Amino acid sequence: MAKTGVFDSDPTAIAKAKELKREMKKLLIKIDDEDDLGVQTIDQLQDALSALREATMRKMAKSSSLEMLETVSCPEEFRCPLSNELMRDPVVLASGQTYDKLFIQKWLSSGNRTCPKTQQVLPHTALTPNLLIREMISKWCKKNGLETKSQYHPNLVNEDETVTRSDREIFNSLLCKVSSSNLQDQKSAAKELRLLTRKGTEFRALFGESPDEITRLVNPLLHGSNPDEKLQEDVVTTLLNISIHDDSNKKLVCENPNVIPLLIDALRRGTVATRSNAAAAIFTLSALDSNKVLIGKSGILKPLIDLLEEGNPLAIKDVAAAIFTLCIAHENRSRAVRDGAVRVLGKKISNGLYVDELLAILAMLVTHWKAVEELGELGGVSWLLKITRESECKRNKENAIVILHTICFSDRTKWKEIKEEENAHGTITKLSREGTSRAQRKANGILDRLRKAMNLTHTA
């Protein structure tokens, strides 16, 4: 078996080494062919040899550090749950879990909308630096003679993010094709842009350089009432990929006057894949607070709620994530209630469908008085009590008791039903002892209210 070379595990280094070797081969052929050897040719050969030597030494140094790291027992709390390697740039996800930034970004860029460790649906995809863990890792590395650099996983550090002249030429050529009047050119270019923005960040970054590039991308969908289905899917998915890149791209995409109307149309008339990706794009764009308000004003909640009611399993999680994130902004909650969210959510939850995701949305909406009123009319107390009593998920129990707490303090006609449940099963008392800290507070609040109601009855 051939011995593994120093470049074998690093695709970027392999490419550089091959390029240097090709250059040296050309120079050697030139030397062999020339009778009168020039000094410039010799200098070029020396430069190529020096560059190859430097690249080799740099790779060997990285390999040495990796070998040393493998021999040292790394504390579990310093390891990324995704890679099981020492974290280089620890960040906190919305779920409260800490990951290495590179690995969690790859997870999110793949379209995932849950925490890998807890499976919790994420309200947003913002990442917060974990400075405490970073400092602890730094001290641990110094103590063990390790450098705190990207060498912990050099193979995954994307050195190809730099936009090359070739990337720019390809990008401009595809934008010219996608904004042309020829449907086949539009479709082939949109498909290629979708693939390029999914694979690498450099093409996402190129879209972020100017608002005009976004307009050119969506241009073929702005004309005509019946867009080609595949073209629509590829353009919408490209918008999703661009939005994942960073906050600057999210702002640029959302503020383009053509994008949100296009996404609304995709939610209403696209294929299942298009509608799902349109919802995912809305979820991603809504990570910015300013975008939540802007998107909410557009009327997008109604088609999202309609799609939720349809209940297509391929789209429903993206739709739920989009509604949840939008409703973090208080002004969007009244819009969601007005557009029929409570009825749709109540029907799904009472039938045991997607309870985890939908109950979290409902727990936010009950801060609006009309949501409480609708839940009462829908018989919501009975199935909320059932979830509180029977669910094995602590988060679902918490959300159910949060909603019941709001109902209890807003509608005294429901006290009797809650009291009967408590007398028969001790459901709320049990939760006040065994639930999450928030669930315990809400359960105790309900019990206090019921006791006061009993005292008033006896006093009267």
UniProtKB/Swiss-Prot annotation:
- Segments forming domain U-box: 73-147
What top-tier enzyme class does this entry carry? transferase
On modification after translation, the UniProt record reads:
Phosphorylated by SD1-6 and SD1-7.
Give yes or no: UniProt keyword Transport: no
What pathway does the annotation place this protein in? Answer: Protein modification; protein ubiquitination
**Which Pfam family, an example, fits this chain?**
U-box
Question: What's the catalysed reaction?
Answer: S-ubiquitinyl-[E2 ubiquitin-conjugating enzyme]-L-cysteine + [acceptor protein]-L-lysine = [E2 ubiquitin-conjugating enzyme]-L-cysteine + N(6)-ubiquitinyl-[acceptor protein]-L-lysine
Mapped ARM repeat ranges: 201-244, 248-287, 289-328
Give the EC number: 2.3.2.27
SMART domains noted in UniProt: Ubox
Give the disruption phenotype, in one or two sentences. Answer: Reduced abscisic acid (ABA) sensitivity during seed germination.
Q: Which UniProt key words apply to this protein?
A: Abscisic acid signaling pathway, Cell membrane, Membrane, Nucleus, Phosphoprotein, Repeat, Transferase, Ubl conjugation pathway
One GO term under biological process is: abscisic acid-activated signaling pathway
Record's Gene Ontology CC terms? nucleus; plasma membrane
GO MF assignments = transmembrane receptor protein serine/threonine kinase binding; ubiquitin-protein transferase activity
Q: Does the keyword Transmembrane apply?
A: no
Q: What is the role of the protein in this entry?
A: Functions as an E3 ubiquitin ligase. May be involved in the abscisic acid-mediated signaling pathway, at least during germination.
Q: Subunit comment for this entry?
A: Binds to SD11, SD16, SD17, SD18, SD113, SD129 and SD25.
Name of the protein in question: U-box domain-containing protein 9
Q: What is the lineage of its organism?
A: Eukaryota, Viridiplantae, Streptophyta, Embryophyta, Tracheophyta
